[in-house]
Curated annotation (Swiss-Prot):
Protein's UniProt name: Glycogen synthase 1
GO molecular function, one term: alpha-1,4-glucan glucosyltransferase (UDP-glucose donor) activity
NCBIfam families membership: glgA
Organism of origin: Geobacter sulfurreducens (strain ATCC 51573 / DSM 12127 / PCA)
Pathway: Glycan biosynthesis; glycogen biosynthesis
Gene: glgA1
Job description of the protein: Synthesizes alpha-1,4-glucan chains using ADP-glucose.
Length: 501
């Protein structure tokens, strides 16, 4: 088919700025789409943490004029760089007033008071950028609430724009919990008219809800797993917008994220003390001792080691782990944790470490190299999430022969196959109830399997390491989604004439 012009608008992108999995997708997916022959470009803020010299950014001539409704025109500089290892352009919006801050979204766990202006600006700038760079997008791809106003603008203020008005829009929801809820006055900054501040528009609970606007206006929608696409349509996981999602269910698909196997490969990983493969696991034992040594635990081969890497917040199930941890540590096991999050968890698990110094290791913060070492050295990886749109660590764990223990939700349920003791199939362990008892019972099941079923452990590890989640597959599905959006936007006849199928 003919090459598509795709403009991705996002609030974060690896390696420039990252707070969550959104950044990983935006930093990798464009490369694979470019490999398929498409012209993909990314636009994001130039946060103060992004060093133009370090990333080889160049400032483009001219100034981007960004209309901001009642606030009038605002102006920003535009810098251009590349996604590392590719020719994919990334455009950075330089606005000191909005993005010259320590955090991306918040400071001291408090969201910035002007986040509505900051990200309405990002969305509106994404609509104006094509004029500056001479690029005519066929598809605008927005991510989460931060750029959910892009499809809103495309369907309203830019509907008849000669450069971008014919483009389709895709909105990817990475997390329904975060919606961009602001005072009604945000409508004045959007500048699209109060007629859109309705139940069938951007209004929710008498506030301006940017995600809701995007869900209504995007040509098509997707999220990052088929399981989460179903869950978003329920009151439990829809966070008050499940009715909107159900109304758009015919236009919603789930596309599981891929894994960058160039970075996450135990055969070549430079972060781990010894490399290993599915056919030769000897190096994994050395990796286990390395992790035990780092955390000051006894270097034992004869005890199962459980790892956890991630944000220490309730969404990730840290509350039920806290409730179960003493019962877990009463077993003959070791547990190591790497992460940061809710302050209470730092103190709580710090006390657990002091109480069980030979069984429990803790590292508060984030350390990429250590996360690789924990994935390689652990026997099991714990992910007791309350909800998980996709999740990546369970996929890393499978590649490293570290069996995931997951709550069956969202992408965790999609990517992990539960152990079948009779047939020795599966590649991990699942539980369904989000409570400490279910977590503890499943850990007990894994401990029993570790000590009493060596045949099962060998089969599970082999199954796990054979599983693949490639970005090639994910990118092909996004290409299908873009074509679907264009057929809907333009009509099948126009689409075929322009793009050839």
């Amino acid at each position: 088919m003919t090459r598509l012009n795709i403009l991705m608008a996002a609030s974060e992108c690896v390696p420039f700025a990252k707070e969550g999995g959104l950044a990983d997708v935006v930093g990798v997916l464009p490369k694979y789409l470019a490999h398929m022959g498409h012209d993909v470009r990314v636009v994001m803020p130039l946060y103060s943490r992004i060093d133009p010299e370090r990333f080889g950014l160049e400032r483009l001539p001219g100034v981007l004029v960004v209309p901001m409704g009642i606030m009038g025109n605002q102006y920003c500089g535009v810098w251009e760089g590349r996604l590392p290892g590719s020719a994919v352009p990334v455009y950075f919006l330089e606005h000191e007033g909005y993005y010259g801050r320590e955090g991306l979204y918040e400071e001291d766990n408090v969201g910035y008071m002007d986040n509505d202006n900051r990200f309405i600006f990002l969305s509106r700038a994404a609509m104006e950028l094509p004029k500056l760079i001479g690029f005519a997008p066929d598809v605008f791809h927005a991510h989460d609430w931060h750029t959910a106003a892009v499809p809103v603008f495309l369907n309203t203020l830019y509907r008849d724009d000669p450069l971008v008005g014919g483009a389709a829009s895709v909105l990817t929801v990475h997390n329904m919990q975060h919606q961009g809820n602001f005072y009604p006055g945000a409508m004045e900054v959007l500048g699209i008219g109060w007629e859109h501040f309705t139940f069938l528009g951007l209004e929710k609970d008498n506030q301006t809800n940017l995600l809701k606007g995007g869900l209504y206006h995007a040509t098509v929608l997707n999220t990052v797993s088929e399981g989460y696409a179903r869950e978003m349509q329920t009151p439990e996981y829809g966070w008050g917008l499940d009715g909107v999602v159900r109304a758009r269910s015919a236009d919603l698909v789930g596309i599981l994220n891929g894994v960058d196997y160039e970075e996450w490969n135990p055969e070549t990983d430079p972060h781990i003390v010894a490399n290993y493969s599915r056919s030769d696991l000897s190096g994994k034992k050395l990796c286990k001792r390395d992790v035990q040594r780092f955390f000051g635990l006894p270097e034992r081969d004869d005890v199962p080691l459980f790892g956890l890497v991630g944000r220490l917040v309730k969404q990730k199930g840290i509350d039920i782990l806290a409730e179960a941890i003493h019962r877990i540590l009463a077993l003959d096991v070791q547990v190591v944790m790497l992460g940061a999050g809710e302050p209470w968890s730092h103190f709580y698990f710090g006390d657990v470490r002091n109480e069980y110094p030979e069984k429990f290791g803790l590292y508060i913060g984030y350390n990429n190299g250590l996360s690789h070492r924990i994935e390689a050295g652990s026997d099991f990886f714990v992910m007791p999430s309350a909800f998980e749109p996709c999740g990546l660590n369970q996929m890393y764990s499978l590649r490293y022969g570290t069996l995931p223990i997951v709550r069956a939700t969202g992408g965790l349920d999609d990517s992990v196959e539960n152990f079948d003791e009779q047939n020795l199939t599966g590649n991990g362990f699942k539980f369904w109830s989000h409570d400490a008892d279910a977590l503890f019972d499943t850990v007990g099941w894994t401990v029993h399997t570790w000590y009493r079923r060596k045949d099962a452990m060998a089969a599970l590890i082999g199954n796990a390491m054979a599983k693949r989640f490639t970005w090639e597959d994910s990118a092909a599905r996004y290409e299908e989604l873009y074509c679907r959006a264009l057929r809907k936007r333009l009509g099948v006849g126009v689409f075929v004439r322009r793009f050839g199928g």
